[in-house]
Amino acid sequence: MGDESETAVKPPAPPLPQMMEGNGNGHEHCSDCENEEDNSYNRGGLSPANDTGAKKKKKKQKKKKEKGSETDSAQDQPVKMNSLPAERIQEIQKAIELFSVGQGPAKTMEEASKRSYQFWDTQPVPKLGEVVNTHGPVEPDKDNIRQEPYTLPQGFTWDALDLGDRGVLKELYTLLNENYVEDDDNMFRFDYSPEFLLWALRPPGWLPQWHCGVRVVSSRKLVGFISAIPANIHIYDTEKKMVEINFLCVHKKLRSKRVAPVLIREITRRVHLEGIFQAVYTAGVVLPKPVGTCRYWHRSLNPRKLIEVKFSHLSRNMTMQRTMKLYRLPETPKTAGLRPMEKKDIPVVHQLLSRYLKQFHLTPVMSQEEVEHWFYPQENIIDTFVVENANGEVTDFLSFYTLPSTIMNHPTHKSLKAAYSFYNVHTQTPLLDLMSDALVLAKMKGFDVFNALDLMENKTFLEKLKFGIGDGNNLQYYLYNWKCPSMGAEKVGLVLQ
């Protein structure tokens, strides 16, 4: 990272954003506004499977450390405030406040209940402890929307990224690859490929101004990004035009410069200009106020490698050989008529998906064009397989997307190839059989692990197919400027990349 970003002039105290402070999909790491230092929150999909107590010791040590920090900060409090400039006093008070509420973002509702959310208390979202029984916007749509962009810290400038330019796409890939979501132990980091980013960021209706970048003025280096994509969302009995907020990322060396809140305010302004006032996003941290909470589960496909890179561990009384045998899969799928999705299947996949999602409370409402974009197979991005019966009718389909993770500091293995369950629809084939075949197909394609959230009907097959619950954070689902009762994971029917 060039000197420009390190030496950029300190920004003025950030104004409280008026905006859709969501960030999506962990993607969707919004609590930067409360604690800028921890910009990359774990969405849950990276965390090792929970089959050992090996981390308990670490947690104890961490707690001790935090206790020490709190004590130290308390001792530091009697500074001669009146001998310092007002700006410096504010900084010290802010630091003391951070220590007093505990280090880092809240991972559980219990932790969150002890935090104060000064930023989120100004936003159109329900309060954490609020019991919501109504449905509708928190505040009405705005008529007069700010026309000029928000002010960035000195030395930085806005740039709407043209992802059709391979050089720009590569810059975004590099920013995310080096600074985006890591697991809590800094062992794995999402590795979104340039092609995957085009798939995730350019669905039907995408707008270039919603690919919102921040550059260093002098070097033109890309140091920040946030995105929005359009989506029709069905929430309980209402269908609403929203955006999905995603890929909030700030370069590690800029985490103290309060860039993230400005990014979120700016994407909100740009979305408001298009007449959209609601958003959906996910995060691995607890903010006011989750509408649903899901958890990642992991199914070993290549147990030896997963153990070698410490993604999972040998259970007590288990040898490597017995573990390999436990997770062994058939050589080929067993469902008759299972084949890759073709162009001719788009209308029937659209129909099957639309019908299936009606049973859930939070779902996308996709057009046929969107179904083509999100489900038509692309190598190393999205795989969809349909089941065609003897009469030539497509009755079921399964899908998973590809999202590898970089393995940090391992002498042999550099990448972990992970498949993520997307949408799976069954009318004739039992879901258990369909997902068993999904595992076989993923194994055949060289994946190391198959990840799935416990949403929709997924709980019915997770344990039976030998998935293990992740030991990472929950994935929280949020709505911006929309109030509704919260729901169980089994009623969430929305998967964000």
Swiss-Prot record:
PTM notes: The N-terminus is blocked.
Domain of life: Eukaryota
Known partners and oligomeric status: May be associated with other proteins.
Composition bias type Basic residues, residue spans: 55-66
A GO MF term: glycylpeptide N-tetradecanoyltransferase activity
Keywords: Acyltransferase, Cytoplasm, Membrane, Phosphoprotein, Transferase
Biological role stated in the UniProt entry: Adds a myristoyl group to the N-terminal glycine residue of certain cellular and viral proteins.
Transmembrane helix is among the record's keywords: no
GO-annotated biological processes: N-terminal peptidyl-glycine N-myristoylation; protein localization to membrane
EC number in record: 2.3.1.97
Name recorded for this polypeptide: Glycylpeptide N-tetradecanoyltransferase 1
Catalysed reactions, semicolon-separated: N-terminal glycyl-[protein] + tetradecanoyl-CoA = N-tetradecanoylglycyl-[protein] + CoA + H(+)
PANTHER family referenced in this protein's UniProt entry, alphabetically: GLYCYLPEPTIDE N-TETRADECANOYLTRANSFERASE 1, N-MYRISTOYL TRANSFERASE
Main location: cytoplasm
Spans annotated as Disordered: 1-82
Uppermost EC category: transferase
Family statement drawn from the similarity comment of this UniProt entry: Belongs to the NMT family.
Bilayer topology: Peripheral membrane protein
Compartment annotation: Cytoplasm; Cytoplasm, Cytosol; Membrane
Pfam families per the UniProt record, alphabetical: NMT, NMT_C
One cellular component term from this protein's GO annotations in UniProt: cytosol
Keyword Acyltransferase: yes
Phosphoserine: modified positions: 31, 47, 83
Binding site for tetradecanoyl-CoA: 118-120, 247-250, 256, 258-260
Organism: Bos taurus
